[in-house]
Amino acid sequence: MRLDAEVSFDLKELFGVDKPAVAMAHLPPMPGTPLYDETAGPAAIVESVARDVEHLVGAGFDAILFCNEGDRPYQLQASLEGVAMMARVVAEVAPSDRPFGVDYLWDPQAALAVAAVTGASFIREVATGAYESDMGLWAPDAGKLLRYRRELDAEHVAVFMNITPEFASTVGTRDIATTARSVRVSSLADAILVSGPMAGAEPSVDAVREAKRGCGDETPVFANTGVKSSNVKDFLAVADGAVVGSDLKVDGGTWNPVDPERASRFMTEVRAVRESL
């Protein structure tokens, strides 16, 4: 538990390496959502994610991040059946030999609840700021989230905060460096994430650099979307780690299954970066 906002979160203690690569395990549409395949049922969701996780672990990713990417259009409050389905998937297929995390689009408390009961090490969420978004006006509450973490006795679950969320734009005027520093200090982020405008869309390297300037060495910064085998070297030259999803999929499509060859190619590039450190 962080008692002092100036105490750096130990990224290497969690992931075991410098410049960790976190791979997305995207859940297909879950029960109750518009694209859910009720004929295939919940078992098909578990089987799909299990196959992807097997490929990602085989490629050597340092951690797996489970996310309900298939639940379009997204909502700001999770459904009971969605939380139950995600908890089932994570409990059944999470790897036992490396860290894993949870991201519930776009409900931080739901992500934390699933993480707490499944043994996850971290969550990724938008927890601060105010936005105009595809889901309407959006104003998450970091204070509520971290108090809920205390209620659950889940302070071992790190909170990675995305400060430039996909499918949204901020209504504020602060620059990225100022925002990153403020979120680090006032909202006690364990890590800061910088995203592009949509899933699979890359942020600028300069945006990641600015977030890092705001955080210094106190809080790690991740490139959160759009990282590819072709650009991961550029991002990891600035960022402390990377989250990747779309580039690992068949034809680079966000909602496609994982392509083992693309996953292996990505990790080959990451290892080359580490060897150059």
Spans of model-derived segments:
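N-terminal amphipathic alpha-helix/helix-capping segment at the start of soluble metabolic enzymes
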Residues: 1-42, 146, 150-151
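Catalytic cores of alpha/beta
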Residues: 107-119, 178-179, 211, 217, ...
